[in-house]
């Protein structure tokens, strides 16, 4: 299930001129992702919540723009999941399936900040900071930070500057 909410409103002069305030949230909840429990198994398993496959992800934020300037603050969240799996048993007998096991990977959250300006004929400039709160990527059950680099950003706090000039 995906849910996208967006609310925009005009705001009065806040000392910098009249502007526009935008609140948004993008939410994804994966209910099922079925596949074979393991190669050769006829048993199907819902993979959501297993290692590296969180069930939910969402982003929410606020944008404020006025005149030729804007500022944006975004919180990015990735849900939790279990570290490992083990064979499924029923009355002591293997069923050909797997179940979640091991510890639980915590939810992960970071903040991004972006400021921008349209300078007319001089172009557009943007300054931003990814992972503003400098949250480390979450390690796997053995303490390895490189395991989930496709899921978490392992760069740490990163600032950037962009100047776009069209001619």
Please give the residue ranges for each predicted region.
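Generic long, charged, amphipathic alpha-helical segments
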Residues: 75-76, 84-111
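Short sequence motifs at beta-strands and strand-loop junctions characteristic
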Residues: 50-55, 105-109, 153-155
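Outer-envelope beta-barrel architecture signal
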Residues: 15-21, 56-58, 67-69, 109-111, ...
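C-terminal beta-signal and adjacent terminal beta-strands/loops
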Residues: 31-34, 77-91, 116-167
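Extracellular loop and loop/strand-boundary signature of outer-membrane beta-barrel proteins
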Residues: 43-49, 90-93, 97-103, 146-151
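Gram-negative outer-membrane beta-barrel transporters
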Residues: 1-87
């Amino acid at each position: 299930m995906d849910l996208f909410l967006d609310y925009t409103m005009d705001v009065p002069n806040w000392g910098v001129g009249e502007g526009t305030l935008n609140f948004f949230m993008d939410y994804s909840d994966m209910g099922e992702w079925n596949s074979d429990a393991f190669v050769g198994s006829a048993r199907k398993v819902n993979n959501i919540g297993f290692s590296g496959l969180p069930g939910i992800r969402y982003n929410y934020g606020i944008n404020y723009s006025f005149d030729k300037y804007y500022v944006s603050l975004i919180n990015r969240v990735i849900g939790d999941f279990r570290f490992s799996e083990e064979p499924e048993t029923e009355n002591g007998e293997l069923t050909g399936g797997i179940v979640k096991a091991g510890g639980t990977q915590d939810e992960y959250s970071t903040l991004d900040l972006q400021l921008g300006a349209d300078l007319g004929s001089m172009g557009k400039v943007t300054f931003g900071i990814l992972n503003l709160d400098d949250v480390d990527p979450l390690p796997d059950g053995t303490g390895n930070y490189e395991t989930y680099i496709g899921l978490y950003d392992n760069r740490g706090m990163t600032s950037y500057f962009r100047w776009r000039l069209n001619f």
